[in-house]
Amino acid sequence: MITIALPKGALLKDSISTFKKAGLDFSNALEENNRSLTFESNCKRAKALLVRNGDVPVYVSYGQADLGIVGYDVLRESELKVAKLLDLGFGGCHMSLAVKKNSNYLKPTDLPANCKVASKFIKTARSYFEELNIPVEIVHLTGSVELGPITGMAEAIVDLVATGKTLKENGLIKIDDLYYSTARLIGNPLSMRLDDNHLRDTILSIESTNAL
C-alpha cells in the first residue's frame, strides 16, 4: 500500500483533487467533522497522512510516506533528501521582500547595512541577502511576520505573498520577489528504488492528468 503525506491548510483541497484524478480518492479527509489524521483511499490501494505543510518533507524523507505534496517554499527551506518529482502548478505565490509603505526603501540595496529582517524562512532569507552581499540580521519569527516592521523590530520581512492583501492591510509593500512557489510532488528515494511500479504508475497518472 502506498502511503501519501497530504498537507493541511490551503493546499489540501487541490492535493486531494490531484490524487483523485489519478485514481486515489481521499475526499473523506475534507469532511468537516472528521478529525482523523489517516485515511484510506476508496480503492484501498493507498493511505494518506494528514500533516502540517512543513512536516511533509520530514515524513517523506524518513520513509513514513512514499509520496507527498508540499509547497516549494517549504521544500527549499527544509533541504531534506527527497525525490523532487513534479511541479503541480497550484498554490502559487511569491516569496517576497517587503517593507513599510512609508519607508524610503525602494529596492533591496536601499536597506541599511546590518538591519533586521524578519522571516519564517531564515535559510531562504539568509541566502538571498548573502547573494546580494548585503549584511543583515535575520530575525526568526513563526507567526505574523508583518508585525516586525509595524513594531519597529525589523526594517523588512521575507515572506510568502499570494494576493498582497495582508501586506496592504498592514501598510507594507513588496520591493522584490525572490522566487515563485507552487505545490510540488515529492517522493522517498528508497521507496522509488524499491518500487514495484505502483508508485511509478501513480506518478505517471498525476503527470498526465495534471498536464490537461
UniProtKB/Swiss-Prot annotation:
Pfam families recorded: HisG (PF01634)
Source species, domain of life: Bacteria
Name the record gives this protein: ATP phosphoribosyltransferase
SUPFAM superfamilies (alphabetical): Periplasmic binding protein-like II
EC number: 2.4.2.17
Subunit field text: Heteromultimer composed of HisG and HisZ subunits.
Family recorded in the similarity comment: Belongs to the ATP phosphoribosyltransferase family. Short subfamily.
Domain comment quoted from the record: Lacks the C-terminal regulatory region which is replaced by HisZ.
Cross-referenced InterPro entries: ATP_PRibTrfase_cat, ATP_PRibTrfase_CS, ATP_PRibTrfase_HisG, ATP_PRibTrfase_HisG_short
HAMAP family: HisG_Short
Pathway membership: Amino-acid biosynthesis; L-histidine biosynthesis; L-histidine from 5-phospho-alpha-D-ribose 1-diphosphate: step 1/9
Transferase found in the keyword field: yes
Entry's Gene Ontology cellular component terms: cytoplasm
Predominant place of localization: cytoplasm
Locations listed in the record: Cytoplasm
Catalytic activity: 1-(5-phospho-beta-D-ribosyl)-ATP + diphosphate = 5-phospho-alpha-D-ribose 1-diphosphate + ATP
Role summary: Catalyzes the condensation of ATP and 5-phosphoribose 1-diphosphate to form N'-(5'-phosphoribosyl)-ATP (PR-ATP). Has a crucial role in the pathway because the rate of histidine biosynthesis seems to be controlled primarily by regulation of HisG enzymatic activity.
Molecular-function GO term, any one: ATP binding
